[in-house]
Design a protein with these regions (language model features):
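Alpha-helix boundary/N-cap detector
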Residues: 11, 15, 24, 64, ...
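Phosphoinositide system proteins, centered on phosphoinositide phosphatases
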Residues: 48-85, 90, 94-98, 104
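N-terminal interaction modules that seed assembly of large macromolecular complexes
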Residues: 1-40
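Short, structured interface segments that constitute the first stable element of a domain
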Residues: 34-52
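Glycine-rich, aromatic-bearing surface loops/beta-hairpins
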Residues: 81-141
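Short, hydrophobic/amphipathic alpha-helical patches that form generic packing surfaces
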Residues: 3-4, 35, 69-82, 117-121
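Short amphipathic alpha-helical patches
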Residues: 22, 43-47, 100, 138
Length: 141
């Protein structure tokens, strides 16, 4: 909702929920999510080999595999999914920020990126499915 509302002023929250459910119904999305969550869980349990354990536990900025896994989701909806994801990864609104800054033994190195990817893909799906409803910022200036 947060990503697409400025471009689709009449957007309803229920449309966003439907779009998220559609994204979550895809096998590729399932595979990315279960892989990322499993890696986060194994990291919490200290079961990865070094140096991977340290890298994932610290969410090292140059690791990037967490973003690569997220790209497998956003790429389902083309360049708009990709740019939406970049925006969400940068500003980290709402739950994405909470997941990214979680402490106390929890590892969300992959989860925050996967949640952002699902949101970005759902926003991209809305834009692709309703191109006539999308308000273009350049056209309005």
């Amino acid at each position: 909702f947060y990503v697409q509302k400025p471009y689709m002023p009449n957007l309803k929250l229920e449309e966003c929920r439907t779009s998220v459910a559609s994204v979550l119904s895809k096998r590729e999305v399932h595979n990315a999510i279960i892989t990322g969550i499993e890696l986060d869980k194994l990291t919490e349990q200290n079961k990865l080999s070094q140096p991977l354990q340290r890298i994932v536990a610290n969410d090292e900025s140059l690791y990037g595999i967490d973003e690569i896994l997220a790209f497998s989701i956003v790429n389902l909806y083309g360049s708009i999914g990709f740019t939406n994801y970049g925006y969400l990864d940068k500003v980290k609104p709402g739950i994405i920020k909470k997941l990214d800054s979680e402490e106390g033994g929890h590892c969300n190195t992959f989860l925050d990126d996967l949640v952002g990817a699902v949101a970005a893909a759902a926003a991209g799906k809305l834009a692709h499915n309703e191109p006539n409803r999308v308000r273009h910022a350049i056209a309005e200036e």
